[in-house]
């Protein structure tokens, strides 16, 4: 009995030391692992999922949140700039919605303080979904099934843009991607990364990339000028934070993007100017770090970046309520 108790105690100590060692390892790194989340309000998240996928929030009845932030494609659309109402070219590359709850603000220029505020923007943007908040409210309120869900979640069946965006934001907060190879390495699995991936991470750290790309999202927590050492050449007119603040000092200052799932979210940069990860790494080295990475270094950094791809959101697609005679009709050609 004493021997068995001693064995169990030693095993417990061994496991405790192992988990403590993994915790210390992660704590000593500039990047932290992502943890799975449970929605604060599961019913609200389910309602938000329905609204996220509902194209009737747009004037055309064709564009939904998922059109530009496709959850089957890394939470983005893989084109330079998104396509809006009547095939209008969007002004800027669509950032991924995955792990977006970790951002200090939303949009490349940070003009929305949170996901709720961000969700309201595209609905009424004439170059995106091109509807109005009032029409979006009428569309949703026209369907009894939606009103029933609003009553269950909010206590009454009143449909407002505030409630619509609150629900969408709650769903988006669930879109995190834990379980990447790099997270497993951070958590103590020394075999999770191969030699090239590990050397790539050391290059990533040693070159200064982690000064901006750090934390659980590997970015998203700060702003930085695009073109610190050398100007970034682009035809895109976006001026970054200056478009929000009006301060010349904020010209070409953008929110640092997350690098989680980066292999899925091409093309890269606010203008979609880098078609491949290799091109993005080369450009960042040159204009942000004043460093010319050689081919082998680029290859190893890219190998590391691909270890940041986590478990993608896995859920059942919503069945949307049917429109009825009271539902405002789409106007795709107007």
From Swiss-Prot:
Q: Which Gene Ontology cellular-component terms appear in the entry? A: periplasmic space
Which amino acids does the record list as binding heme c 1?
65, 68-69, 270
| Top EC class for this record | oxidoreductase
PTM statement from Swiss-Prot or TrEMBL = Binds 2 heme c groups covalently per subunit.
List the cysteine pairs that form cystine. Answer: none
- Please list the residues that bind heme c 2: 209, 212-213, 284
Q: Where is the composition biased (Polar residues)?
A: 322-334
Instruction: Write one Gene Ontology MF term.
Output: metal ion binding
**Name of a matching Pfam family:** CCP_MauG
EC no. given is 1.11.1.5
> Which keywords belong to this entry?
Electron transport, Heme, Iron, Metal-binding, Oxidoreductase, Periplasm, Peroxidase, Repeat, Signal, Transport
Q: Where is the signal peptide?
A: 1-26
Which parts of this chain are annotated as the region Disordered?
Answer: 315-334
User: Where found?
Assistant: Periplasm
Q: Which reaction does it catalyse?
A: 2 Fe(II)-[cytochrome c] + H2O2 + 2 H(+) = 2 Fe(III)-[cytochrome c] + 2 H2O
PANTHER family registered for this protein in UniProt: CYTOCHROME C PEROXIDASE-RELATED (PTHR30600:SF7)
The name of this protein is Cytochrome c551 peroxidase
Q: Which organism is it from?
A: Nitrosomonas europaea (strain ATCC 19718 / CIP 103999 / KCTC 2705 / NBRC 14298)
């Amino acid at each position: 009995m004493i021997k068995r108790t001693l064995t169990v105690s030693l095993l417990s100590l061994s496991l405790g030391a192992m988990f403590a060692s993994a915790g210390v390892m992660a704590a000593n790194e500039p990047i932290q692992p992502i943890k799975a989340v449970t929605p604060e309000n599961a019913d609200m998240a389910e309602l938000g999922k329905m609204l996220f996928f509902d194209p009737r929030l747009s004037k055309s009845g064709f564009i939904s949140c998922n059109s530009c932030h496709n959850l089957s494609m890394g939470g983005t659309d893989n084109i330079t700039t998104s396509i809006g109402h009547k095939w209008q070219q969007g002004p800027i590359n669509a950032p991924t919605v995955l792990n977006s709850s970790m951002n200090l603000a939303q949009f490349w220029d940070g003009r929305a303080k949170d996901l709720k505020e961000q969700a309201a923007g595209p609905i009424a943007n004439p170059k995106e979904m091109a509807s109005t908040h009032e029409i979006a409210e009428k569309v949703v309120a026209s369907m009894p099934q939606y009103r029933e869900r609003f009553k269950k979640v909010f206590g009454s069946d009143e449909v407002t843009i505030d409630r619509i965006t609150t629900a969408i934001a709650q769903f988006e907060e669930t879109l995190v991607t834990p379980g990447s190879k790099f997270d497993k390495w951070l958590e103590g699995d020394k075999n999770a990364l191969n030699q090239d991936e590990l050397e790539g991470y050391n290059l990533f750290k040693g070159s200064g990339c982690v000064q901006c790309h750090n934390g659980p999202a590997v970015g998203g927590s700060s702003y930085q000028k695009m073109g610190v050492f050398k100007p970034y050449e682009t035809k895109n007119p976006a001026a970054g934070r200056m478009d929000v603040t009006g301060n010349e000092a904020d010209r070409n200052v953008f929110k640092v993007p997350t690098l989680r799932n980066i292999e899925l979210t091409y093309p890269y940069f606010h203008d979609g100017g880098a078609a491949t990860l290799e091109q993005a790494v080369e450009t960042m080295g040159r204009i942000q770090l004043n460093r010319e990475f050689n081919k082998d270094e680029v290859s190893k950094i890219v190998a590391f970046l691909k270890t940041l791809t986590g478990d993608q959101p896995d859920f059942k697609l919503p069945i949307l309520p049917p429109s009825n005679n009271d539902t405002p009709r789409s106007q795709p050609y107007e």
